[in-house]
Amino acid sequence: MKPAMETAAEENTEQSQKRKGCFECCIKCLGGVPYASLVATILCFSGVALFCGCGHVALAGTVAILEQHFSTNASDHALLSEVIQLMQYVIYGIASFFFLYVIILLAEGFYTTSAVKELHGEFKTTACGRCISGMFVFLTYVLGVAWLGVFGFSAVPVFMFYNIWSTCEVIKSPQTNGTTGVEQICVDIRQYGIIPWNAFPGKICGSALENICNTNEFYMSYHLFIVACAGAGATVIALLIYMMATTYNYAVLKFKSREDCCTKF
């Protein structure tokens, strides 16, 4: 029979080893989390959601403003209505694609991070795994360039609505309010190329333009386009983070897969 003091000491030692083992396991698991990819995933989800949701509603509001004020003849803006409807369907596709792609990128980030940090023993990777990582690097670069174009394109309606809003502010200003020159301050939507030059009326002036700026459709569409543009910018930043993370992981995997590799990053 062992003394009670020795038995208690052994039990305390076993408990401390178990706690230490649990702590080391938690640290090991946390070390395998791709924090850069995780931040990029949250940012990408938020950006795509803002762009798709706000952009869809803003496009519908833009069509309503054009039909009610700038182009009363349906045949004049028929092509624009079809293009906007097509863009709304494209938005559905973008949201679905990025929902899947970002999840796959996050899973790939967990795989490559675990392999790079050798969390499961010695370094293990296959040629197929490195090929898949390289494919994700290429796709992410292509999507990053494409979203730069989307970000620039989403700034166009913001610029257009800002010009209309600033013109309305000029009409409301005390310097021009009540003068005969107010009715000569106009906005010609045809100059932006979204409706043909023969569209009627195409140009709105004075108090009629001020009434348009006071409508809920204009207010909501203007601010939703701003939020959609910000969402596109957030998506670009997320893809840039993905580019850096995937490129670094692929480079390390490629380097460590060499037989003559003797240096570790």
From Swiss-Prot:
Pfam families according to UniProt: Myelin_PLP
Alphabetically ordered keywords of this record: Cell membrane, Developmental protein, Differentiation, Glycoprotein, Membrane, Neurogenesis, Osteogenesis, Phosphoprotein, Protein transport, Transmembrane, Transmembrane helix, Transport
GO biological process: axon development; central nervous system myelination; extracellular matrix assembly; negative regulation of protein localization to cell surface; negative regulation of serotonin uptake; ossification; positive regulation of bone mineralization; protein transport
Topology relative to the membrane: Multi-pass membrane protein
Annotated localization: Membrane; Cell membrane
Glycosylation sites: 73, 177
Phosphoserine modification, residue list: 257
Family: Belongs to the myelin proteolipid protein family.
Subunit (UniProt): Interacts with SERT.
Protein name per its UniProtKB record: Neuronal membrane glycoprotein M6-b
Organism expressing this protein natively: Pongo abelii (Sumatran orangutan)
